[in-house]
C-alpha cells in the first residue's frame, strides 16, 4: 500500500513538474513574441480606407507603425506592410499614380510579410473572378469582389481560424476567395466560403479584425 502510494505521488509530482515546465515555456514564448513585436516597424498603406484602426491595434500590441501616403514614405525602413480595407479600385489606381506600385510589389515578391484586409485581399489576388482589373497580383488566390456586398451587406459572425480558435469577424461589403492554388493555405471559411488564407509571407482576410477588440489575427501576422 505504502509503495503504491509513493508511486502515485511520484507520478503526480512528475505530472506537476511537466505542467509547470509547459506553463514556463508558454510564458517565455509570449515574452519573446512581445519583445520581437516591439522591435518591428509596420507600414500601413494610408491612401484610402480603414487604416487608422489597424494603427490602433498595432499600437496596442506594442509595434511601431507609420503611414504610407506618398512616394517618399516608401523609402523609410519597415519590416512588414498592411493593406487596409476600402475601395480596391481607388487604392489600385492611387498605387500607380503615386508611383508606389512597383516598389510595394517588389518588396512583397522579395518576401516581406504583407497583410491585406477586404480590399487588400483583392489587391493581392492573382485574379478577380468578377472584375477584369489587375492589381499587385502577388498571391495565388482568385477573389470574388463585393461578393457579400451584393447579397448580405455588412454582418458580424464568429468562426474558426486555423491556429487561433474561434474569432469574431466583421464583414463590410466584403469579398471572399473563390479559389486558392499553388501553396496557398486556407485559414478560415464561413458558410463554405473562403474568408482567410495565407501563402508564405502573404496573409489575407475578407473580414476586418481591426474593427473588433480581438487582436489575435494581427498577432498572427506580426509573428509570421
Residue ranges, per PLM feature:
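Amide-donor transfer/coupling interface in amidating biosynthetic enzymes
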Residues: 9, 145-224
